A protein has these predicted regions:
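Active-site-proximal acidic segments at structured loop/helix or strand boundaries
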Residues: 141-210
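Acidic/histidine-rich, metal-coordinating catalytic segments
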Residues: 84-104
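Active-site beta-loop-alpha junctions of metal-dependent nucleic acid enzymes
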Residues: 59-87
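Mobile-element integrase/transposase regions
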Residues: 3-57, 65-72, 204-210
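Short small-residue beta-strand/loop micro-motif enriched in glycine and branched aliphatics
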Residues: 55-60, 97-98
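RNase H-like two-metal-ion nuclease catalytic core shared by retroviral integrases
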Residues: 90-91, 102-103, 123-145, 161
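Two-metal-ion acidic nuclease core segments, chiefly of the RNase H-like superfamily
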Residues: 104-123
Length: 210
């Protein structure tokens, strides 16, 4: 990823691109797809984080969409992108939101509050039942299922599966999407400039119960 960003910086054109999404912000969600890992059939749950300005994405898979998977997915995504988004848009998943208060604000779960405090990003939420509020990541959830997991993935381990998914995310950086003249990777340069620096250590992705 670092090599690609360096090359994209060198090639970046001076041109005006109408911006639908501000750079430096993200959306996150989970999807599901069938996979065979070490000979065992699973309904894999895959974490997706997107940067809607550039359409850059990160995808990694888990046996279940647990709290630990949410936390680990953030750690991996931030490392992949090389920084922390200014804000991340979510749905109201129970691993993240303990409850929605009367004023519409969210009471975070203890684990998610720890993650947010460690990385210092703003957490934002879509309206309950309104998946189109985070349409960018919803689109990539479907794209990843069709393009990264068809035919049904078969790998010796979850680590091998996730290496494959990361390679696919890197390859996608070369794509030029409809309505754009720059590749995803070229647009990602603007996102990267507005990401905040990673802390010295990643967050401990273990859900500690009181």
């Amino acid at each position: 990823m670092k090599d690609y960003v360096f090359a994209a910086r060198q090639r970046q054109r001076e041109m005006f691109v109408p911006l639908t999404h501000p750079a430096g912000h993200a959306q996150a969600d989970f999807g599901e797809a069938d996979a065979v890992i070490a000979g065992v059939e699973y309904r894999a749950h895959y974490f997706v984080m997107t940067l809607p300005h550039s359409d850059s994405c990160f995808v990694c898979a888990y046996p279940a969409a647990t709290t630990e998977a949410w936390l680990d997915g953030h750690n991996r995504a931030f490392n992949f992108f090389g920084g922390v988004p200014q804000s991340i848009l979510y749905d109201n998943d129970k691993c993240l939101v303990a409850r929605i208060l009367r004023d519409g604000s969210r009471q975070r779960t203890r684990a998610f509050s720890g993650l947010q405090s460690h990385y210092l990003f703003e957490d934002r939420y879509g309206r309950p039942g309104k998946g189109n509020d985070k349409g960018n990541v919803e689109g990539v959830v479907g794209y990843a299922r069709r393009n990264f997991m068809t035919p049904r993935p078969r790998f010796a381990s979850w680590d091998a599966f996730n290496r494959h998914l990361e390679e696919q995310c890197c390859k996608r950086q070369r794509d030029v999407l409809r309505g754009h003249r720059e590749s995803i990777g070229e647009r990602f340069v603007r996102d990267l400039e507005l990401l905040t620096a990673l802390p010295p250590t990643p967050f401990d992705a273990c859900d500690k119960q009181a």
